[in-house]
Amino acid sequence: MNNPSKAAQKKPKSNLIDGWEVVIGIEIHTQLATQSKIFSGSSTEFGQDPNTQASLVDLAMPGVLPVLNEEVVNLAIRFGLGIDAYIDQASVFARKNYFYPDSPKGYQISQMDNPIVGLGHIDIQLEDGTVKRIGVTRAHLEEDAGKSIHDQFEGQSGIDLNRAGTPLLEIVSEPDMRSVEEAVAYIKSIHTLVRWLGISDGNMAEGSFRADCNVSLRRPGDAFGTRCELKNLNSFRFIEQAINVEIERQMEILEWGGTIDQETRLFDPNKMETRSMRSKEEANDYRYFPDPDLLPVIIADEQIKAIKATMPELPAARRERFIAEFAITEYDAHVLTLSREMADFYEAVVAAAGGAAHGKIAANWVMGEFSGALNKAGLELADSPVSAEQLGGMIARIVDNTISGKIAKQVFGFMWDEGKSADTIIQEKSLKQETDTGAIEAIIKDVLAANEKMVEEYKSGKEKAFNGLVGQVMKASKGKANPAQVNELMKKLIG
């Protein structure tokens, strides 16, 4: 489903840093958008009082058994289809054995040998337009742990098990990234995809989307170096900062002849450093074995086919279509497909504006004035007081010369504040563009008569003088004169 564009054929720029090649692999944990947990009926709603959403299953009480939530399987399949991956139709759950206070069972139900999603890939686009394909090793289902609370009780720690059993999809990349830019672009691409497919809200502030970054250095052509894992990074800014800091740390050690210890490290954004958390475990440290309480997940061809039928057009395909159909730039197409909601909004604006021929002006308005108003007001797209149909209707009035681009900004401001259509605003505020040739000629003649010096300057070759005269006409018409007509008539009258 992800076909690399022509940009993928570009020769990549060198990513060497002082002769070292950076190697990065990413593990992403994204919370699946289900109403209940993966193995119990407890709610997954965020922000509730501690331990109010933990059932007997989540608490690991004796005699209770996990029951798989079918929806998490469907969402995992949906993701697999989105990255053109292999779907294992006989997937197995395993117990990952370790002890943490916020994990009541003493193990985590995860997947090891038979993950539900196998090899796949996703294409990322870098700032210079280069497209690179990143391999996805696997994506497997697992349950989240609870949360330890250390700052609410003096001398004691609390345990909140509301998150215990929350369904996660862990997405593991190949170590294909060779720079911080590529790593951030990959994580952003996965973030866009899981929201686009509706499998996760991707809310990083609430812990719905977290990244672990494995970083190592090597000389070009050498075997992979020893990697360190940067754990639980939950913002794109922190991800970029943490990887840069870790690269510098490892480079300094290696340049002085030292060796890198394989370990898990935490990033401290205040001190701008990473510090050791624990030695990095290998799979055999967790003593994985199939969970005896859960049967293998058998996925029928019909189930995959039914999910495939509900798949939306993917971001990469939509970008390519926008470029071809609406004649917009790669950059515009990239920005307009950062979310499915924005892409849908843009297409609705184009339709209301009169069709594909107006794709570029629609892109300019959506990305410019409209997005600026959203940001200034601190609103999400869904809360916009101006609908796609209203914005497209206003653009249609620019296209048919009812209003100029300058007047359109005034119209948009009134639409934003009053929630009315462009046509209503134009009529109520008397903002219709003046296109009557006689009326415009009369204004031009008055301006020329009052500015004889500027007329002579223009005749002597000073183009600025002409622009000044046009500005005077626009001012006299209160911005209503058609700029193209003003230019044409002005030149005709000056001779």
Curated annotation (Swiss-Prot):
BP GO annotations: glutaminyl-tRNAGln biosynthesis via transamidation; translation
Enzyme Commission numbers on file: 6.3.5.-
Catalytic activity field: L-glutamyl-tRNA(Gln) + L-glutamine + ATP + H2O = L-glutaminyl-tRNA(Gln) + L-glutamate + ADP + phosphate + H(+); L-aspartyl-tRNA(Asn) + L-glutamine + ATP + H2O = L-asparaginyl-tRNA(Asn) + L-glutamate + ADP + phosphate + 2 H(+)
Highest taxon listed in the record's lineage: Bacteria
Signal peptide region: none
Assigned keywords, A-Z: ATP-binding, Ligase, Nucleotide-binding, Protein biosynthesis
Molecular function per GO: asparaginyl-tRNA synthase (glutamine-hydrolyzing) activity; ATP binding; glutaminyl-tRNA synthase (glutamine-hydrolyzing) activity
Top EC category: ligase
SMART domains assigned to the protein according to its UniProt record, in alphabetical order: GatB_Yqey
InterPro entries membership: Asn/Gln-tRNA_amidoTrfase_suB/E, Asn/Gln-tRNA_Trfase_suB/E_cat, Asn/Gln_amidotransferase, Asn/Gln_tRNA_amidoTrase-B-like, GatB, GatB_C_1, GatB_Yqey_C_2, Gln-tRNA_amidoTrfase_suB_CS
HAMAP family according to UniProt: GatB
Subunit structure, as described in the record: Heterotrimer of A, B and C subunits.
Family: Belongs to the GatB/GatE family. GatB subfamily.
UniProt function note: Allows the formation of correctly charged Asn-tRNA(Asn) or Gln-tRNA(Gln) through the transamidation of misacylated Asp-tRNA(Asn) or Glu-tRNA(Gln) in organisms which lack either or both of asparaginyl-tRNA or glutaminyl-tRNA synthetases. The reaction takes place in the presence of glutamine and ATP through an activated phospho-Asp-tRNA(Asn) or phospho-Glu-tRNA(Gln).
Protein name per the record: Aspartyl/glutamyl-tRNA(Asn/Gln) amidotransferase subunit B
Origin organism lineage: Bacteria, Pseudomonadati, Pseudomonadota, Gammaproteobacteria, Moraxellales
